[in-house]
């Protein structure tokens, strides 16, 4: 029997059996678009609302502050672009590192092509940045 070692947990992880069990009805029976107006979607719309409320309780915030995305890439892209465009008048500098996930690096490149000044800091062998480099990047 061959044993496998999976080392890319940054990309995806094992799904806990309880999560699979909870989600199974939405993959097999109730798969309607929760944003649509037809009744087939009511169960899904209710499930998403309740999920948002549960997460908000855990995080002690409003359900209106909870957003679900389909992936880490989508979340990275959305967060970085959202902050960049919302704060564009305050400054167009974005500081990150050269070892970020490609979703971050590609979004940085996208924003640079649209006039943002994206600074990529080096890291040491442990993945740490130099605070002096950060300070310089912040004051340029």
Label every model-predicted segment.
Residues 1-140:
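Pyridoxal 5′-phosphate
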């Amino acid at each position: 029997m061959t044993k496998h070692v999976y080392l890319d947990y940054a990309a995806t992880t094992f799904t806990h059996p309880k999560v699979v069990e909870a989600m199974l009805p939405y993959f097999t029976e109730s798969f309607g678009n929760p944003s649509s107006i037809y009744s087939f979607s009511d169960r899904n719309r209710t499930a998403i609302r309740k999920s948002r409320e549960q997460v908000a309780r855990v995080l002690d915030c409003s359900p209106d502050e909870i957003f679900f995305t389909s992936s880490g890439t989508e979340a990275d892209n959305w967060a970085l672009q959202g902050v960049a465009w919302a704060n564009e008048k305050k400054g167009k500098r974005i500081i990150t590192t050269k070892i970020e996930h490609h979703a971050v690096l590609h979004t940085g490149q996208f924003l640079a092509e649209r006039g943002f000044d994206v600074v990529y800091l080096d890291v040491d062998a442990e993945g740490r940045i130099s605070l002096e480099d950060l300070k310089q990047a912040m004051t340029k």
